[in-house]
Structure formats: structure tokens, C-alpha cells
């Protein structure tokens, strides 16, 4: 098989470039994000349209109690009828520094009894509630204490390209040139060329091979922890969904999926009520 030329790889990768927002843990909920925190490519933060007290209850957080619209109740699992556990919420309009999906806020709940992994039959064992705007938000308290300790994050903007297995979906031409389904020494040498080209485009710090897009993040491309690309397609338009939230093992959350598992939430950009869930473990 021919050796890949880095210049050609750059030409194939450049049109795939996206941005993503990495969520970094902080001790206390941030009151505001400076332009330096947001990164050199970010626009100034929008001013909240709601009072400060409303904004504080809707801040991005993992654990604690969720924010909900007035009248909403705590969700139940369709499988076991037990309460879903609140995992995270994201103030997408404020903390999403990337090319965001057209929602302003979302919450994520999960059933630890049924432990869904993304099969269609498990759809009622997890829930994403998304909002184009929060009109009458409130903190939805349930029980005496939350499922997980409340933790907070600040956003950081990064560039994002598909990882190695993601090229099978997003750039089949490059996948076939490597070729991606070969474990030969020549293919591994070609993967190193792809890695160098990707690092040059994203300016991401070098990690172990094929570890692009690691971290807890919203937007961009997923880092597939152990397996092929499992991006779900929208059942209405049949287009691949986009990454909404990726949760890797992190001090941001005590939630764990399997053996050092990574959870991925997806959403269709056109049909935002269409969402998907995947989990991969190392």
C-alpha cells in the first residue's frame, strides 16, 4: 500500500474541522467567564436575558439537583418505573463556545437499575430534556439529597477532527487510503501521518495515538474509547446525529459507566427532539 503524504491528508481533513467546548472542573460555580477563559476564537459571552437568580439555577453542573420548567416533574424509567438519576445539565447558550446545536439548555437523566447502553428497547431508561429557552425555570428538588455531589465547570474552546475510527463515517476516502481496516505496519505508519496532520490543524497537544477529542466536552467529534464509530442516525431525516455531550471518567462527576466507560449523547441538528445514547468501555 502506498505511503500517505501529509499534504494530501491535510487537504482531506481541513473540510472536516469543527469546534468543541471542553468542560474543565472548578471548585465553585463561575459567576462569569472572561474572554481569556473562553479562548481566543470565542465571541464575548452573551448577557443573560433572565435575572441573575435564574441564571444561577441554570448554570452548567454535574450532579446536584436539576433545573426544570415550572410544571415539569421528576422523570421515571419506562423499564423499571423507578426514578431516573440526574447526571448533568448544560447552559448551552452561555457555555457552548462551539458551533452549537439550536438549543439553549439541556438536562440529562439516567437509570442505574436498567443501565441502558443505547439499544432502541432501552430508550425510556434515559432522558434528555432540551429547551430553546427557559421561561420559568426552577430547581427540581427530589428526595433528601442528590444522586451525585454537585460539581461545576468552565468552558474552553478547541478545534476538533474525527478520531481514527471516526474517519470511517466522516471521510471514507482517507479511511480507505490508510486503509483503516488493516493492522499492517504500513497502515500504522499511515495512521501516524494522519495524527501529525490532525495535530497540525487543531494545535491540540499530542497524546497517545488515536486519542483525539478526549475529555468531557460538548460538540465537536466524539473520542471513541474502545470500538468503531457508533454515531446514531436521526430516524426522521436519516442523517448522522451530532455530539451533544461526552462524559469521560473525570473529577467532574462520580457517575461511572461500566469499566472506565465513556458516555456519548447525540442530537439531530434539524430534529432536536431526536437524541441518541452510546457507551463504550476501555
Regions found by a protein language model. Name each.
Residues 1-282:
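Preference for intrinsically disordered or flexible, low-complexity segments
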Amino acid at each position: 500500500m502506498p505511503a500517505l503524504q501529509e499534504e494530501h491528508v491535510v487537504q482531506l481533513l481541513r473540510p472536516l474541522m469543527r469546534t468543541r467546548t471542553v468542560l474543565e472542573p472548578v471548585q465553585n460555580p463561575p459567576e462569569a467567564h472572561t474572554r481569556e477563559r473562553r479562548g481566543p476564537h470565542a465571541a464575548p459571552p452573551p448577557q443573560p436575558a433572565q435575572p441573575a437568580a435564574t441564571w444561577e439555577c441554570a448554570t452548567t453542573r454535574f450532579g446536584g439537583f436539576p433545573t426544570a420548567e415550572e410544571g415539569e416533574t421528576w422523570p421515571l424509567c419506562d423499564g423499571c418505573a423507578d426514578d431516573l438519576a440526574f447526571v448533568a445539565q448544560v447552559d448551552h447558550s452561555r457555555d457552548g463556545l462551539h458551533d452549537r446545536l439550536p438549543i439553549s439548555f439541556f438536562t440529562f437523566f439516567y437509570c442505574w437499575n436498567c443501565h441502558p447502553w443505547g439499544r432502541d428497547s432501552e430508550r425510556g431508561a434515559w432522558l434528555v430534556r432540551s429547551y430553546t429557552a427557559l421561561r420559568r425555570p426552577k430547581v427540581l428538588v427530589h428526595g433528601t439529597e442528590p444522586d451525585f455531589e454537585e460539581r461545576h465547570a468552565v468552558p474552553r474552546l478547541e478545534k476538533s477532527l474525527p478520531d481514527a475510527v471516526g474517519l470511517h463515517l466522516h471521510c471514507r476516502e482517507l479511511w480507505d487510503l490508510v486503509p483503516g481496516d488493516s493492522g499492517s505496519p504500513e497502515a500504522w505508519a499511515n495512521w501516524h501521518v494522519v495524527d501529525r496532520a490532525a495535530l497540525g490543524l487543531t494545535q491540540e497537544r499530542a497524546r497517545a495515538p488515536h486519542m483525539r477529542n478526549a475529555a468531557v466536552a460538548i460538540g465537536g467529534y466524539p473520542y471513541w474509547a474502545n470500538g468503531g464509530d457508533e454515531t446514531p442516525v436521526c430516524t426522521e431525516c436519516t442523517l448522522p446525529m451530532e455530539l451533544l455531550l461526552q462524559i469521560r471518567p473525570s473529577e467532574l462527576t462520580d457517575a461511572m459507566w461500566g469499566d472506565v466507560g465513556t458516555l456519548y449523547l447525540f442530537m439531530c441538528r434539524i430534529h432536536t427532539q431526536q437524541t441518541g445514547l452510546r457507551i463504550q468501555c476501555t
